[in-house]
Amino acid sequence: MVKTEKFIQKSVEEIQKEAGNEKVVMALSGGVDSSVCASLAARAIGDRLIPIYIDTGLMRKGETERIKAVFGNIRLQVVDAGDEFVAALAGITDPEKKRKAIGERFIRVFEREAKKSGATCLLQGTIYPDRIESEGGIKSHHNVGGMPEHTAFKKVIEPIRDLYKDEVREVAGALGLPPEIQHRMPFPGPGLAVRILGEVTKEKVAVIREANWIAESEIVEKYRPWQCFAALIGLGTGVKGDNRIHGWIVAVRAVNSRDGMTADPLEIPFADLVRIGSRITAEIPSVARVVYDITPKPPATIEYE
């Protein structure tokens, strides 16, 4: 458990020291990690903070609209970079290379936006599990191992780098952030790209975006998982009507966890799983098969890539 008031005071002082008199751009995704960072930085440097939301084209259904609505009261800059990210991922199938391509593109977009405002520092919501998995070679997170070696920023500020996810939520509560942010399900920085095995294309993104929305709509309110989602894991043979199809295989995953370091699969009644599978195959014609992932972490990671 983190001593929230002491942590908040220390973090504000750290941001002030690191930023000096410089302007700071920050990556605001709308999740609890980046929202806590935004709140801390706003206290520390006021209007020298420039929050930026990058629409990568890899976001969940309605995500960008939700961000605009929730953070409409601050000077949030929204950057549409979807075509850039899809182009950067073209032809890449290796998960590590995908994460590094996304990390590189994030930094280049932030550098471009920072240049417009004269900002020289970048602030981001890296947390301790990101560092453990990246440094331990499990998988590179876009904001740690996936970042390019050289950037135009004088400093990268990471005020919550030593916190676990449950500790970040405690700090969010102490900062007075609304429950919808404090308890929001994690969503990976690389977005739906890490829920697509193999090359990322606009067609695949459209399929998994809809499947993910169906999975969340069926599971979140009823079961309150730590995280749930759908992933596109390959192609398989199916039958629709009297016709054979070669369609997508979608895996649904729902887990409970405390800090994201370990996780257990959610025990969803079979009837509900059947309904989820039926909805996905009926509402997305190109999907031929739906499976439910019962693997804990470890041995699996929560996300597929």
Swiss-Prot record:
Its EC number is 6.3.5.2. Disulfide bonds: none annotated. InterPro entries: GMP_synth_C, GMP_synthase_B, GMPS_ATP_PPase_dom, NAD/GMP_synthase, Rossmann-like_a/b/a_fold. Keywords: ATP-binding, GMP biosynthesis, Ligase, Nucleotide-binding, Purine biosynthesis. Pfam families: GMP_synt_C, NAD_synthase. Catalyzes the synthesis of GMP from XMP. Heterodimer composed of a glutamine amidotransferase subunit (A) and a GMP-binding subunit (B). This is GMP synthase [glutamine-hydrolyzing] subunit B.
